[in-house]
Structure formats: C-alpha cells, structure tokens
From Swiss-Prot:
A motif (ThyX motif) lies at residues 78-88. Its cofactor is FAD. One of its GO terms (biological process) is dTTP biosynthetic process. The gene is thyX. FAD binds at T55, R78, H79, R80, E86, N172, A173, R174, N178. GO terms for molecular function: flavin adenine dinucleotide binding; NADPH binding; thymidylate synthase (FAD) activity; thymidylate synthase activity. Binds 4 FAD per tetramer. Each FAD binding site is formed by three monomers. The active site is at R183 (involved in ionization of n3 of dump, leading to its activation). This is Flavin-dependent thymidylate synthase. It comes from Thermosipho melanesiensis (strain DSM 12029 / CIP 104789 / BI429). Its EC number is 2.1.1.148. Residues 1-217 form the ThyX domain. Keywords: FAD, Flavoprotein, Methyltransferase, NADP, Nucleotide biosynthesis, Transferase. Belongs to the thymidylate synthase ThyX family.
Amino acid sequence: MEFKVLDKGFLRLVDILGDDYSAVKAARVSYGKGIKTPEKDKNLIFYLMEHKHETPFEHIVFTFHVKTPIFVARQWFRHRIGSFNEASLRYTELKDEFYLPDHIRKNIVEDKQKAVRVEELKLKEQALELIYNSIEDSYKVYRKLLELGVAREMARIVLPMSSYTQFYWTVNARSLMNFLNLRADSHAQWEIQQYAIKIAKIFKEKCPWTFESFLKFNYRGDILREVEL
C-alpha cells in the first residue's frame, strides 16, 4: 500500500507482522487458550482496549517507508518507541526536491499550538515568494559548494528544513496508536497530520477490530472522526 502525501512525499507500507488475531492470541496465552469465534475474538479486542490492557497490541508490527520534509521527520523521530533508519546526506547528494507549500498559516493568539490558513491574497503571495526564493538560493549554494569540492557532510549545512528525506519506520500497534493520538490531531502541525491520516487508513484496513476499538475507547485526537478513512 502506498499513498502520496504533500507535494512530493509518500507513505508506503513495506511489511506487517501480525493482525487482530495476533493480539487475541497474545492476550489468551495467559490462560492457555487461543482463537475462538470471530465474535468472541472481536469482543476481546474491545475489552482489552477499553480497559487499557495494551501489551497484546505490541505483537502487531508495521514497517513503513516514508518520504517527508526534514522538519516533519524531526517531529516524527520524537516518538521514541520504534526503529528508524534515515537516508544520509553525508554519503549521498540531495536531489532538487523540496516541500513547496501551497498555502500560508498564521498562529492563533488563543492557542499557540494551532495555526489557521491565511486568506489575504497579497500576504500569501509575499510569504510564498520569500519561501520559494530562500529554498532556491540555498540549493544553489549547496551545488556550488559541491562543485568546489567541499565534502557532502559540510555542504549539507546550508540546506533548508524543507528538504525531503526518506526513512524506514518499524513500530508496533501500541506505539502507532500513541502516534495517532498526538499527530492525528488539530494541535499537531498540518503537514504531519497528513501522514497520520494515511497511517490511520492502513491501520484500519490491516487491523479493523483494533482500529475500531481504538477509535471508540482510546483515541484522544479530533481529526480521524472528521475525515473519510
């Protein structure tokens, strides 16, 4: 499964270990029992989620391949429970790929974590022009440094946070749900929200019972109930 995200990014499901039944079997091993009827197995998933017995969900593991701007990746890497491998700009040259937003946002005085889109056309045009010009100038300097023979590990220091990077992310379902609680929420930055929504789509398809129970009992965000998954 793969989804296009932002202007040049993507989210790709590389591998998955387990499903809803993995959590069921992990929960029932304590009693020496396994899978029963679908109805009873689904009810068990809902019981585990409602009563915060979450360790069985750690036996469902996803691996994603992500392409995203560096500023999004740095927010992503704050989620410590998971494994990351990122492309290195010390050993590879950066392609001419940058996140170019199509809108501008301003902070809300009442809530510093939220931002709203700017509708004033003149301000939007001025801000976007400054962003685009800054990115273009930075990349020109980067290429010039490489042409001069400067090492990639030094030339990269002029690159903007809008540069695209790629990484692998391996995460269990319990930690993935924590990610969705924090990033599939209007308080998170809009760009990472877009990735969180696509992750939720994959989660729903691959583990429908777990996702449904998560949305009912444990989801603390606000946008997954407002979008079509």
